[in-house]
């Protein structure tokens, strides 16, 4: 007799929480540069991206991610990112250039200029922007060859 599997609950949307050094400055950045709707709670939302901005108690609490260790066991020849990622946002291939130019036009800091790479049967476009506290927001797109 086959054992009955137990029902499992479903996770909902996950949100990133970001400790920032100056809440008002960060709210302006996410609103004016990234085009987010920002509420008084500190939620910065645009399309499928939501980041919760919270005032850090001290500057030492603001800690963007460091570069991750390289790995040899990815399914393709990729070993990992070349810089620290705090947020990775998938965008469509067609929207990628539009978003980069919008952010650049709004005064956003493009820390890593857009580049294209390949892994197996996939072509990728990535860029990295930095917010006022140095958090890396990677915009990435992919398509099959």
Spans of features found by a protein language model:
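Vicinal oxygen chelate
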Residues: 1-15, 34-92, 98-130, 141-145
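A conserved hydrophobic helix/loop-capping motif in glycosyltransferases and polysaccharide synthases
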Residues: 17-19
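Conserved active-site tyrosine of GNAT-family acetyltransferases
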Residues: 26-31, 103, 134
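Short, glycine-anchored, charge-dense loop/turn motifs used at functional sites
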Residues: 131-137
């Amino acid at each position: 007799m086959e054992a009955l599997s137990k029902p499992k609950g479903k996770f909902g949307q996950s949100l990133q929480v970001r400790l920032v050094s100056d809440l008002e400055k960060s709210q302006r950045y996410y609103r004016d540069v990234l085009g987010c709707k920002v509420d008084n709670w500190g939620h910065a939302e645009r399309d499928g991206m939501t980041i919760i901005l919270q005032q850090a108690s001290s500057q030492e609490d603001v800690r963007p991610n460091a570069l991750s260790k390289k790995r040899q066991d990815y399914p393709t020849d990729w070993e990992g990112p070349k810089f620290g990622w705090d947020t990775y946002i998938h965008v469509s291939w067609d929207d990628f250039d539009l978003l980069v130019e919008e952010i650049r036009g709004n005064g956003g800091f493009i820390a890593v200029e857009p580049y294209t790479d390949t892994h197996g049967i996939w072509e990728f476009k990535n860029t990295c922007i930095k917010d006022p506290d140095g958090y890396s927001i990677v915009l990435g797109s992919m398509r099959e060859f």
